[in-house]
A protein has these predicted regions:
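Glycine-rich beta-strand-to-loop/alpha-helix junction loops that act as flexible
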Residues: 13-15, 40
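ATP/NTP phosphate-donor binding region
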Residues: 1-13, 20, 24-25, 58, ...
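ATP/nucleoside-binding phosphotransfer catalytic cores, i.e., glycine-rich phosphate-binding loops
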Residues: 130, 136, 161, 171-247
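Catalytic core of DAGKc-family lipid kinases
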Residues: 28-143
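Gly/Ser/Thr-rich active-site loops/lids in small-molecule metabolic enzymes
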Residues: 101-108, 155-178
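A generic structural signal for short beta-strands and their flanking turns/coil linkers
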Residues: 122-124, 138-140, 163-168, 203-205
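Short amphipathic alpha-helical segments
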Residues: 23-26, 48-50, 155-156
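Glycine-rich phosphate/pyrophosphate-binding beta-alpha loops
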Residues: 86, 90, 143-158, 223
């Protein structure tokens, strides 16, 4: 981005981590070309959000007649994310996955680490501001969503949109196993629009996560930021080639 200035289209070949690097570079240098995605990662969350296809060949073909659509993004201090920002249980699981052996046996190393996280009591007392309103309580996870998917799973709320000018906030206060099942295990049938004990949901333009300090935040699978955090939506910041969803 520092060297290339006059271009209209960027094709990103890779997963959400690669896309994260590209959009942060474009944001830093105030560039806004059209972006096309050819998925090549583990989960490919944002390629699903733009409905371009999970298969690289299929996605390449879909790009030929895709439409340009503007999408919001999450600004966390000075870094950008497209899909989500989270602390607590999901971030702890991401850290366990990062620690796991990346060899053939990596997945088998990761599974017991997941259950280790689920069975530990790692809840925390939080203080937050959501659009100026102060909230305090105890939680196992705070999850801020912009995209439609997280970790390959559809975010379980029916009216979420990455182009509506707001972020969706989930504060999970129930037991870890219950929260894990609700948010990631039953997303096709479980809808947080319904009243659910132990889970608070909000729509917000700005979130301040005040305490506790020092929690590692997972932003689109990247683990390089810690709390406290100032989070806000940047409306229609990026242009992606996308396909409409069938009604």
């Amino acid at each position: 981005c520092k060297e290339l200035k006059d271009f209209d289209l960027v094709i990103v070949v890779g997963g959400d981590g690669t896309i994260n690097e590209v959009i942060n570079g474009l944001y830093d240098y105030d560039m806004n070309p059209v972006i096309g995605i050819i998925p090549g990662g583990s989960f490919n969350d944002f390629s699903k959000t733009v409905n371009i296809g999970a298969d690289p060949v299929e996605a390449s073909e879909n790009l030929l007649d895709a439409e340009v659509k503007e999408y919001d993004c999450i600004l966390n201090d000075d870094k950008i994310a497209l899909n989500f920002w989270t602390v607590g249980m999901a971030s702890e699981n991401a850290q366990k996955m990062q620690e796991a052996d990346k060899s053939t046996f990596g997945v088998f190393t990761y599974i017991p680490k997941i259950f280790e996280t689920l069975t530990q009591d790692n809840s925390f007392d939080y203080e937050m501001e959501i659009d100026g309103k102060t909230l305090k309580g105890n939680a196992v996870m705070v999850f801020v969503a912009n995209g439609l998917y997280s970790g390959g799973v559809e975010v379980p709320i029916s009216d979420i949109s990455p182009s509506d000018g707001v972020l969706n906030v989930f504060i999970v206060e129930q037991s870890k196993i219950g929260a894990f099942k609700a948010m990631f295990g039953q997303s096709n049938s479980f809808d947080f629009n319904e009243e659910n004990e132990g889970v608070q949901t909000f729509k917000a333009k700005e979130i301040k996560f005040i305490s506790p300090e020092g929690l590692i935040a997972d932003t689109d699978g990247e683990l390089y930021q810690k709390t406290p955090s100032n989070i806000k939506v940047v409306e229609k910041r990026f242009k992606f080639l996308s396909k409409p969803f069938e009604q």
